[in-house]
């Protein structure tokens, strides 16, 4: 194959020269081996095979494993088998290593052991066999480049103290150092072996290069030139042909940079030009023809890029690629390659220049977010690949063709480096988008395109080397940016790379090795990766993630097209000749530029690109500087149409990524299982419950996730506060209006008294609404109401009311007939409060039902029954509230304890009209005969319509009885007594027939009834005297034994937890008749038994007096008639009354116990048994309603519950608990402070003082004095019963802030120490310790 003089990428011949069999060859020469400075176990050893002509593997030891077992850089998974080093024995197995022979025996024993490593991932994994060149030198290496002479297989490597010419032999696969230009006295020989250790005389001074050493070789006529940084600011040019010790290889030195040089490059077309860039932000172009002296301090062109340090600068390459077509062979080249160059800067900007107009950059791209480190041009297209410290490799289009306007990218943002021309460009909308971005994950320091022609940019290969710890060179195909095509592993991190041709690539590493690979023999990453994978989508296993993709390739198949941006020619144009001047200095690019400078401007060139906006250069002779304030040339042609940012600047994708399919497999399976196999779910629940029983932690986590802890909804606090304030104002106005109206009809008082009454109304309303502790309490309000009711009953005969008493009670005002119309306004507010209470009850009932079902799912029947008990008790309260109707007469006539139970939760006793004495035998029945013990009660004491009907008829029938004088009986009373006597005789006869005996187990004394009569405020002294005059009944016969009845718990435990049918359960007379309505039930407080005893007395008149005294007020009170058992005993006046009152038993049914008392008992049981979840749940739901315990204890319990949630990583539930918690500052001091453990100074035990804390807390609860808790502290120890160290000055316990004197260690109060040292100006310790303690 004939090669063009400009062709750089010479191909390796298909057939290689065979190696002689009877010849022992090593990749390191014999002389080189003998001249090594060290010959220990880590040095190289020669392995001779008896019948082998092939070289052995290089190292006798395995290289250290610098990379992890699995690498995830760039998102590519590579098993260890694929990442095995090319230098490992297992990496070159005998069956695939062309350099090791499988037959024969070793003639000399050595330490080398060849091991084959089995691939556990894939049995078809290809091993690497592409490493064909490798050698190790004893000099530090930092840069490598190829010799652009097709007749010499040469490489140039440079380091801090080394500049060597190396030649590699494809025949014997060896690399040899031919000449070292830094050590001319070294005994180097091109015939045989080479020595890397220079034999210097003692007086010879060794030259050193710059620490940032870059090496480049020339092209064409300057192919024998080597450029290297001799020092930080100079470029030295050496001649490869002067390799003898007599000749001086140094041609010239170029030194005009004021700071360190980072990069330089030879022009492939105009080979006499060299460009350089450095830290001084200047680009300098040198013409080697004009710099023939040994040292040159002036460059031909100098471009100042303002403030950005230049990291890399490159000419556009000028490759000539030969191809065949219908007309024969032709050569493709780029006419612009001799003029264009690009630079990348510390700021991340990429600048493209045209040498014909150097005063203005053509393109400015913000390529990287951090410093840009390197760049490289595509061999035949106008693309530039850049690498930066941000770990990205970006591909940018920098062409000028009009059809690629969408690829034109402007400078955007604030540019601190270059001064852009004065134009009206709107940079805010201009954006820079690369055509392709490869995320490497490490800073990219070196990158090189494969020197091969490609019509499609995505079929190009790009070699990348990093500055990190990755001991590899990655070769990417732009068609696959996520998976590299080849990964070339080395012993140590790579420092540089160079392509010799399309197939051969060399690199150097930190281990001073030079390695060469044939990429055609290297396996691709896709060949060693699995073709599909399936994994769980998340940690909990909720779904599968499956990726399936064909193996594909690294190329994009497209029809072959002729390049549009290149011009077909037989020979690439060399230099630009000036026909008017034959001087070589005035020929070519530099000559044209100089001629242009001699005229008015830079427009003397014939432009080969669209006109761009140019700024006027400010230069002296040959120096150019980009000026920001200069006017532009050809302003008329400064068209900005091509600079308009496009909207679709998106990164192109050559190969579509694989399709990712996600399936919620567990959810699908659960749906199938629930629909077709329902019984399997029950088995799973049983297994889960059994596992939870064995693991308390899992049970706690499950309950914390499933239970409901709060019924509070999110709301706007400010809005609710405003609404409440408006309602309060309206309520106060209504009360004042009602009071004023009533005052007009009664006796008028002074204005001062009216103002005081208004203040009392406002105070009482605010206290009731917001629970203010000042000036009044709920008990005071209740007492005022009770006193008003009593005064009303006492003065019922006179009908005279005191105005202050009426105005102090809203209920008495609304009950008066004179304010009947105005009290309706208050009813609306009462109804709103009632609806709020009902809604709260409904929420609590739903939460209780849910919690019961949660406990039932894990077979925790104890807690299940507890929540069912709470739910049913709340259902009783809800039934009473919904069944009670708000009457216009007594809508606001509520007990104070009813509202307080709901709003403040005070433990108040319910006011009773007929108090009873405490008996010793009332333990069982006392909790069942309390009247309406629920906390949430209706806002009216008036019974429902169904209850009013029988009561009202009863009042009409007994109206005459109510007004009978108690002194003399009349005929009606005799008739009633006669009927009562006949009824009693009939029952006695029936009992006698049954053979039952009369028992006298129950005895009620007469003074019991006298005590009841004295407590009735409406009875007159005359009635009381007549009542005391009645004889004492000695015994009461029991007519019928008490029948067996079901308890409340037995009744409701048999119900289903899914619902509650209140009407059905209450309406069942056989099962759910309350004992207070049982006609013949016996209890210590039974009034039926007392009535039966009255019938047996001889004095019927006195018996009737007592009967009438009890019956009249009971029947006259519509509130207590249907609900008190006392009224039932007095209904035996006639059979008709008995029948009517029997209907009330079916309607009226009080709850068996008080809800507040029940929940308190459950809370105490939960705390005693250590049921944390139930305790916290009760506090969350009922603390603000019933005041289960003290607020501090509730907050402390919730805070500890939060710590438990954090301990078991239930952070979401803990956040919800804090969000919906009814209390503030739950965490208290633990939220922002750390706990400190204190140990006793005497006994050494941890000071907790829990026993004294409980004792003081109990004392504070009993006495109600919270100051008792101030005695508690950690200044004493419960274990040894002694105080800790006292103050050194006052000898009192140290309870608060403590100061310590450092020299002696004495402690004292802050105030005491302050007074001693600061106020009294003392310098010694108060304890008399020697030395100065404070200065």
Curated annotation (Swiss-Prot):
Compositional bias of kind Basic and acidic residues: 945-956, 1009-1021
GO cellular component labels: cytosol; GATOR2 complex; vacuolar membrane
Gene3D superfamilies according to UniProt: YVTN repeat-like/Quinoprotein amine dehydrogenase, Zinc/RING finger domain, C3HC4 (zinc finger)
Stretches for region Disordered: 1-39, 559-593, 600-619, 630-651, 736-758, 783-824, 935-956, 1007-1037
Chain positions with Phosphoserine modification: 1030, 1074, 1081, 1083, 1117, 1127
GO biological process: positive regulation of macroautophagy; positive regulation of TORC1 signaling
Extent of the WD repeats: 207-248, 256-296, 305-342, 367-406, 439-486, 489-527, 844-884, 1130-1170, 1217-1256
Residue spans, zinc finger RING-type: 1294-1335
SUPFAM superfamilies from the UniProt entry: RING/U-box, WD40 repeat-like
Cellular localization per UniProt: Vacuole
Family matches, as CDD domains: mRING-H2-C3H3C2_Mio-like (cd16488)
Gene Ontology molecular function terms on file: zinc ion binding
Record PROSITE patterns: WD_REPEATS_1, WD_REPEATS_2, WD_REPEATS_REGION, ZF_RING_2
Chief place of localization: other
Ranges of Low complexity composition bias in the record: 630-644, 808-817
Keywords, in A-Z order: Metal-binding, Phosphoprotein, Repeat, Vacuole, WD repeat, Zinc, Zinc-finger
Domain of life: Eukaryota
InterPro entries: WD40/YVTN_repeat-like_dom_sf, WD40_repeat_CS, WD40_repeat_dom_sf, WD40_rpt, WDR24, WDR59_RTC1-like_RING_Znf, Znf_RING, Znf_RING/FYVE/PHD
The family this protein is said to belong to: Belongs to the WD repeat RTC1 family.
Role description: May be involved in a process influencing telomere capping.
Name used for this protein in its record: Restriction of telomere capping protein 1
Record gene name: RTC1
């Amino acid at each position: 194959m004939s090669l063009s003089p400009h062709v750089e990428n010479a191909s390796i011949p298909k057939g290689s020269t065979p190696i002689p069999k009877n010849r022992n060859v090593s990749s390191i020469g014999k002389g080189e081996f003998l001249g090594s400075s060290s010959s220990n176990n880590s040095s190289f050893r020669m392995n001779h095979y008896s019948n082998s002509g092939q070289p052995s593997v290089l190292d006798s030891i395995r290289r250290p494993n610098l990379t992890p077992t699995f690498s995830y850089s760039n998102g590519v998974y590579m098993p260890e088998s694929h990442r095995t080093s090319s230098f490992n024995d297992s990496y070159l197995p005998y069956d695939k290593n062309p350099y090791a022979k499988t037959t024969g025996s070793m003639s000399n024993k050595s330490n080398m052991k060849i091991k084959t490593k089995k691939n556990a991932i894939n049995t078809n994994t290809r091993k690497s066999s592409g490493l064909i060149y490798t050698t190790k030198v004893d000099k530090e290496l930092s840069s490598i480049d190829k010799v652009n002479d097709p007749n010499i297989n040469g490489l140039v490597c440079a380091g801090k103290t080394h500049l060597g010419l190396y030649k590699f032999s494809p025949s014997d696969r060896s690399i040899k150092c031919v000449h070292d230009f830094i050590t001319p006295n070294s005994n180097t020989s091109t015939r045989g072996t080479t020595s890397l250790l220079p034999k210097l005389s003692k007086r010879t001074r060794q030259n050193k290069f710059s620490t940032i050493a870059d090496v480049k070789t020339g092209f064409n006529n300057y192919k024998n030139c080597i450029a290297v940084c001799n020092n930080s600011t100079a470029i030295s040019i050496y001649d490869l042909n002067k390799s003898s010790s007599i000749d001086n290889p140094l041609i010239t030195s170029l030194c005009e940079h004021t700071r360190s040089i980072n990069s330089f490059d030879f022009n492939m077309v105009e080979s006499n030009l060299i460009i350089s860039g450095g830290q001084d932000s200047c680009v300098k172009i040198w013409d080697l023809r004009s710099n023939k002296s040994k040292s040159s301090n002036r460059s031909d062109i100098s471009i100042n890029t303002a403030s950005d340090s230049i990291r890399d600068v490159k000419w556009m390459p000028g490759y000539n690629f030969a191809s065949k077509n219908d007309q024969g062979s032709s050569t493709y080249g780029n006419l612009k390659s001799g003029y264009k160059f690009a630079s990348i800067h510390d700021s991340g900007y990429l600048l493209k220049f045209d040498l014909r107009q150097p005063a203005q950059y053509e393109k400015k791209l913000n390529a990287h977010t951090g410093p840009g480190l390197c760049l490289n041009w595509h061999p035949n297209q106008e693309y530039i690949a850049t690498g930066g410290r941000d770990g990205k490799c970006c591909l940018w289009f920098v062409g000028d063709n009009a059809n690629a306007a969408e690829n034109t990218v402007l400078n955007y943002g604030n540019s601190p480096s270059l001064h852009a021309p004065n134009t009206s460009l709107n940079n805010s909308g201009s954006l820079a988008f690369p055509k392709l971005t490869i995320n490497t994950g490490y800073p990219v320091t070196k990158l090189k395109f494969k020197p091969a022609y490609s019509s499609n940019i995505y079929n190009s290969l790009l070699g990348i080397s990093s500055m990190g710890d990755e001991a590899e060179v990655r070769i990417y195909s732009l068609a696959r940016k996520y998976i590299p095509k080849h990964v070339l592993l080395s012993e140590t991190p790579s420092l540089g790379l160079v392509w010799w041709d399309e197939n051969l690539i060399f690199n150097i590493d930190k281990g001073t090795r030079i390695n060469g690979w044939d990429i055609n023999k290297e396996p691709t990453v896709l060949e060693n990766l699995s073709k599909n994978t399936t994994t769980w989508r998340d940690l909990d296993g909720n779904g599968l993630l499956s990726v399936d993709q064909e193996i594909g390739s690294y190329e994009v198949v497209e029809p072959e097209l002729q390049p549009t941006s290149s011009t077909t020619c037989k020979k690439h144009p060399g230099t630009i000749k000036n026909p008017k001047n034959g001087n070589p200095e005035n020929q070519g690019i530099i000559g044209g530029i100089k001629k242009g400078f001699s005229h008015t401007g830079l427009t003397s060139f014939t432009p080969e690109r669209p006109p761009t906006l140019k700024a006027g250069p400010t230069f002296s002779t040959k120096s150019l500087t980009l000026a920001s304030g200069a006017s532009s040339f050809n302003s008329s042609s400064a068209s900005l149409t091509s600079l308009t940012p496009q909207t679709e600047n998106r990164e192109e994708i050559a190969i579509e990524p694989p399709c990712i399919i996600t399936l919620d497999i567990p959810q699908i399976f659960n749906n199938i299982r629930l629909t077709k196999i329902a019984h399997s779910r029950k088995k799973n629940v049983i297994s889960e419950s059994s596992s939870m029983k064995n693991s308390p932690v899992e049970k706690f986590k499950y309950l914390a996730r499933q239970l409901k802890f709060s019924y509070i909804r999110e709301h706007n606090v400010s809005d609710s506060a405003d609404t409440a304030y408006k309602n309060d104002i309206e309520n106060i106005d209504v009360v004042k209006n009602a009071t004023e109206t009533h005052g007009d009809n009664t006796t008028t008082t002074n204005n001062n008294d009216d103002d005081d009454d208004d203040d009392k109304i406002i105070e009482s309303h605010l206290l009731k609404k917001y629970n203010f502790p000042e000036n009044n309490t709920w008990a005071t309000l209740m007492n005022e109401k009770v006193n008003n009711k009593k005064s009303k009953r006492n003065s019922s005969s006179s009908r005279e009311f005191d105005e202050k008493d009426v105005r102090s009670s809203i209920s008495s005002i609304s009950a008066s007939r004179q304010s009947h119309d105005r009290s309706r306004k208050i009813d609306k507010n009462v109804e709103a409060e009632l609806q709020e209470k009902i809604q709260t009850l409904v929420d609590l009932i739903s939460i209780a039902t849910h919690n019961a079902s949660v406990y039932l799912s894990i077979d925790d029947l104890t807690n299940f029954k507890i929540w069912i008990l709470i739910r049913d008790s709340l259902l009783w309260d809800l039934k009473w509230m919904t069944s009670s109707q708000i009457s216009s007469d007594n809508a606001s006539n509520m007990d104070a304890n009813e509202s307080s139970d709901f709003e403040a939760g005070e433990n108040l006793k319910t006011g009773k009209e007929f108090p009873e004495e405490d008996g010793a035998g009332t333990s069982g029945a006392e909790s069942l005969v309390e009247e309406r013990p629920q906390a949430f009660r209706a806002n009216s004491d008036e019974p429902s319509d169904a209850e009013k009907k029988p009561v009202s008829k009863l009042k009409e029938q007994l109206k005459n009885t109510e007004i009978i004088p108690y002194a003399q009986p009349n005929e009606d009373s005799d008739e009633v007594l006669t009927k009562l006597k006949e009824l009693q005789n009939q029952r006695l006869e029936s009992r006698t027939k049954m053979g039952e005996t009369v028992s006298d187990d129950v005895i009620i004394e007469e003074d019991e009834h006298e005590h009841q009569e004295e407590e009735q405020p409406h009875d007159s002294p005359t009635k009381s005297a007549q009542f005391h005059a009645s004889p004492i009944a000695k015994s009461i016969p029991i007519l019928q034994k008490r029948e067996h009845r079901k308890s409340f718990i037995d009744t409701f435990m048999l119900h289903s937890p899914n619902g509650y049918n209140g009407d059905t359960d209450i309406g069942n007379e056989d099962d759910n008749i309350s004992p207070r309505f049982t006609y013949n039930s016996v209890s210590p407080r039974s009034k039926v038994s007392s009535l039966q005893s009255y019938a047996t007395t001889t004095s019927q008149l006195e018996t009737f007096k007592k009967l009438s005294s009890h019956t009249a007020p009971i029947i006259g009170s519509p509130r207590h008639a249907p609900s008190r058992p006392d009224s039932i005993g007095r209904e035996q006046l006639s059979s008709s009354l008995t029948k009517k009152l029997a209907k009330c038993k079916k309607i009226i049914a009080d709850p068996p116990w008080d809800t507040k008392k029940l929940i308190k008992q459950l809370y105490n049981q939960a705390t005693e048994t250590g049921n944390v979840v139930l305790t916290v749940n009760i506090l969350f739901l009922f603390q603000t309603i019933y005041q289960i315990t003290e607020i501090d204890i509730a907050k402390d319990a919730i805070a500890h519950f939060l710590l438990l949630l954090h301990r078991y990583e239930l952070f979401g539930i803990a956040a919800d608990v804090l969000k919906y918690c009814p209390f503030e500052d739950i965490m208290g001091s633990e939220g922002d402070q750390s706990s400190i453990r204190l140990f006793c100074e005497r006994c050494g035990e941890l000071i907790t003082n829990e026993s004294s804390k409980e004792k003081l807390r109990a004392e504070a609860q009993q006495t109600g004095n919270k100051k008792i808790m101030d005695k508690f502290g950690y200044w004493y120890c419960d274990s040894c019963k002694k105080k800790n160290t006292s103050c050194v000055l006052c000898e009192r316990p140290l309870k608060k802030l403590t100061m310590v004197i450092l020299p002696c260690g004495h402690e004292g109060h802050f105030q005491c120490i302050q007074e001693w040292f600061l106020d009294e100006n003392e310098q010694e310790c108060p304890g008399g310790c020697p030395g100065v303690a404070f200065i």
